[in-house]
């Protein structure tokens, strides 16, 4: 097996691992709002995983003469991050427009 095929197999195994370690599709009790919120959070995590898998698949192979530390630093940028909560209030310019008739 050539090195490119081996690299492709390694990347595909990593992507498969990402898909296996994610949370399953949410099911269970709760109000309609709670179920909607759980599905929305699950969809957001799933979109992050798909984007991460795409970046892993399309990530260029590091040149052979590149130090391993540099390649590791580049790969550390590929991470799933928690999404911030949406703001609870409107920005100031929008508040001023809403108050004045």
Swiss-Prot record:
Annotated segments matching region Homomultimerization: 14-23
Region named Disordered: 19-40, 81-101
Keywords: Host cytoplasm, Host nucleus, mRNA transport, RNA-binding, Transport
Annotated GO MF terms: DNA-binding transcription factor activity; RNA binding
Locations listed in the record: Host nucleus, Host nucleolus; Host cytoplasm
Keyword Transport assigned: yes
GO cellular component terms given for this protein: host cell cytoplasm; host cell nucleolus
Motif Nuclear export signal per UniProt: ranges: 68-80
GO terms classed as biological process: mRNA transport
Organism superkingdom: Viruses
Keyword Nucleotide-binding among UniProt keywords: no
InterPro entries per record: REV_protein
Motif (Nuclear localization signal and RNA-binding (RRE)): 31-47
Residue ranges of coiled coil: none
Self-association state and partner proteins as the record states: Homomultimer; when bound to the RRE. Multimeric assembly is essential for activity.
Free-text note regarding domains: The RNA-binding motif binds to the RRE, a stem-and-loop structure present in incompletely spliced viral pre-mRNAs. This region also contains the NLS which mediates nuclear localization. These overlapping functions prevent Rev bound to RRE from undesirable return to the nucleus. When Rev binds the RRE, the NLS becomes masked while the NES remains accessible.
Function: Escorts unspliced or incompletely spliced viral pre-mRNAs (late transcripts) out of the nucleus of infected cells. These pre-mRNAs carry a recognition sequence called Rev responsive element (RRE) located in the env gene, that is not present in fully spliced viral mRNAs (early transcripts). This function is essential since most viral proteins are translated from unspliced or partially spliced pre-mRNAs which cannot exit the nucleus by the pathway used by fully processed cellular mRNAs.
Protein name: Protein Rev
């Amino acid at each position: 097996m050539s090195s490119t095929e081996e690299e492709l197999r390694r990347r595909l195994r990593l992507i498969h691992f990402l898909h296996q370690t994610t949370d399953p599709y949410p099911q269970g009790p709760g109000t309609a709002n709670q179920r909607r919120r759980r599905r929305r959070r699950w969809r957001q995590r799933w979109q992050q995983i798909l984007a991460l898998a795409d970046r892993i698949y399309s990530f260029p192979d590091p040149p052979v003469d590149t130090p391993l530390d540099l390649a590791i630093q580049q790969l550390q940028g590929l991470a799933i991050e928690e999404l911030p909560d949406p703001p609870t209030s409107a920005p100031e310019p929008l508040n001023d427009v809403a108050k004045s008739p």
